[in-house]
Amino acid sequence: MTVAAVRRAAARRIGSASPTAALDARIIVAHLLGCVPEQLPLRDEEEAPASLALEAETLAARRAKGEPVARMLGEKEFHGLTFVLSPDTLVPRPDTETLVDAALAVIEERWGRDAPVTILDLGTGSGAIVVALLTELPNARGAGIDASAGAVKTAAENAARHGVADRAGFAVGDWTRGVRDRFDLVVANPPYVESGAIAGLPVEVREHDPHLALDGGADGMDAIHAILADLDRVLAEGGVAFVEIGAGQAAIVGGLAEAHGFRCTFRPDLAGIDRVAVLRRQRETDDNGPHG
């Protein structure tokens, strides 16, 4: 049996359970062979190891039941980097890359990528946001806060994996409570799903992502309220905050931001949905230098 035959069999086993069955199968087989998916076509005609078909079938069956590939493999690519996952962390999603790209664009325009900016990542999870930023900003320093000790451990592991551990620190905390410093950038992907909507999420999210990282309270805004209430204290003069929000939440978040003294613009995701709230103090201009 060839590698290509194993891959096709895995895709058939996943079937209609995933709209990306062929891609899922390719990722699974590549992982089992210890190569990247892009290299798999070069190995299609190889004779598959005896164990490959059985292992691929086992993982494909799990995928067919709704388990995400990233959960099975324990890692996920985000912004060109591979991040280790744990049960305490969300699987990083393309929507959140919109936040990273928005932050990088503002930094480049305002201070330049070599500036010694400081970054606070609230609800850091796997550390995907702050680690991705630090790999692009050679003189930046970052701190990540999360309510889960397991997530903090995973974030530190990812910082080490990508060579930025000497510029990143992580701690268990409740949003901004206990944060003493002020930061040029505050970034956050907080829980913003309404509690009553959790049960209606896709099975791969509902049953495999930590509810602590999903549940935003009755109206989905609990964490956003908490962040905005203390943002002025932790954001340096001239600083900018980037907060991921849910579909349909832009008007509410914009009103809350204004009530707390911030002007708010939005960056859309690839689907055209306002996904990232970009917040600056109403009284400030855009010419302040980095705090760090």
Residue ranges with predicted function:
Residues 1-21:
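Non-catalytic nucleic-acid substrate-recognition regions in nucleic-acid-modifying enzymes
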Residues 18-19, 137-139, 160-165, 234-235, ...:
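Short helix-capping segments at alpha-helix termini
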Residues 27-105:
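Conserved AdoMet
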Residues 28, 66, 96, 129, ...:
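Residue-level signal for inorganic ion chemistry
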Residues 98-200, 248:
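Conserved SAM/SAH cofactor-binding pocket of Class I
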Residues 192-223:
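Mobile active-site "lid"/loop adjacent to the S-adenosyl-L-methionine
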Residues 218-280:
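Conserved Class I SAM-dependent methyltransferase catalytic core
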Residues 277-292:
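C-terminal lobe and adjacent flexible extensions of AdoMet/dcAdoMet transferase-like proteins
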